[in-house]
């Protein structure tokens, strides 16, 4: 398995092309060889290809806006082909951070054709979870279960986010096992406690989640890319947080 950096962690430094270029260099200087492109400014596919090459990085996953996926599926795939990325991601189900029966049904209706087209063109479609997918629909089933059942494994993969699974009160390792063969990419994100009984995101190894076990289960489930993400670094420098996570994972023998 390969360690990667989810660029959403350092999105505030990639709001324009110059900043994006410098961000890629800084991430590479930490030691990362792969990235997920998400939360950055807009870019042309050829520009990204050239910037990745300059920094010695490869892009293994993206997050693409829902409208672009629905309205321009073929162009999205063509762009990914330019910068040699086979994995195309959706960051969340459209719905403003919540899900209802109606929102879920529209999601399936809108994205089943997208998933089929992406597969037809030789790419893979990935869905990134938050916590809301672990709420229950009117029939008593978890929405995450409904998603896994509605989309065949060959049409939908999952970017399992360890923090949000844990936040939802679910067992991370159990879900990695449950999605075995569909979790080529995993978002590694730690959870720490605070003195006011609130949880917060932390660099890997600086919280309380059992990442040695999570990583072991990920390997058994066929995961290829372990992508470090920290949505909020609070008072810390996001690049310093990425380095802390990188150093911890390297100490476990990962590259």
Residue positions per predicted region:
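Hydrophobic faces of well-ordered beta-strands that scaffold small-molecule active sites
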Residues: 3-7, 35-37, 59-64, 88-90, ...
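Conserved, mostly hydrophobic/aromatic
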Residues: 5, 27, 35, 52, ...
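Glycine/small-residue-rich loop that forms an oxyanion/phosphate-binding "nest" at active or ligand-binding sites
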Residues: 71-110
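Short, electropositive alpha-helical surface patch
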Residues: 53, 61, 65, 140-152, ...
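N-terminal pre-domain/capping segments
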Residues: 1-87, 250, 254-255
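Acidic-and-aromatic substrate-binding clefts and catalytic sites of carbohydrate-active enzymes
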Residues: 11-17, 34-47, 64-73, 95-99, ...
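Acidic/histidine-rich catalytic cores of soluble enzymes
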Residues: 120-208
């Amino acid at each position: 398995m390969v360690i990667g950096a989810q660029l959403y962690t350092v999105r505030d430094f990639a709001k324009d092309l110059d900043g994006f270029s410098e961000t890629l260099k800084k991430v590479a200087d930490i030691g990362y060889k792969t990235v997920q492109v998400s939360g950055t400014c807009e870019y042309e596919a050829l520009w990204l290809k050239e910037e990745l090459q300059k920094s010695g990085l490869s892009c293994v996953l993206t997050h693409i806006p829902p409208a672009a996926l629905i309205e321009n599926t073929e162009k999205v795939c063509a762009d990914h082909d330019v910068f040699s990325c086979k994995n195309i991601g959706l960051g969340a189900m459209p719905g403003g951070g919540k899900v209802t029966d109606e929102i879920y049904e529209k999601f399936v209706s809108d994205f089943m054709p997208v998933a089929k087209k992406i597969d037809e063109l030789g790419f893979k479609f990935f869905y990134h979870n938050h916590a809301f997918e672990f709420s229950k629909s009117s029939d008593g089933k978890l929405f995450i279960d409904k998603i896994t059942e509605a989309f065949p494994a060959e049409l939908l993969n999952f970017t399992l986010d360890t923090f949000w699974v844990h936040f939802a009160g679910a067992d991370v390792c159990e879900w990695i096992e449950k999605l075995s063969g569909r979790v080529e990419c995993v978002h590694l994100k730690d959870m720490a406690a605070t003195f006011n009984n609130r949880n917060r995101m932390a660099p890997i190894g600086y919280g309380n989640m059992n990442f040695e076990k999570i990583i072991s289960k990920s390997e058994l489930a066929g995961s290829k890319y372990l992508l470090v993400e920290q949505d909020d670094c609070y008072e810390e420098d996001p690049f310093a947080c990425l380095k802390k996570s990188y150093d911890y994972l390297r100490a476990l023998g990962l590259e």
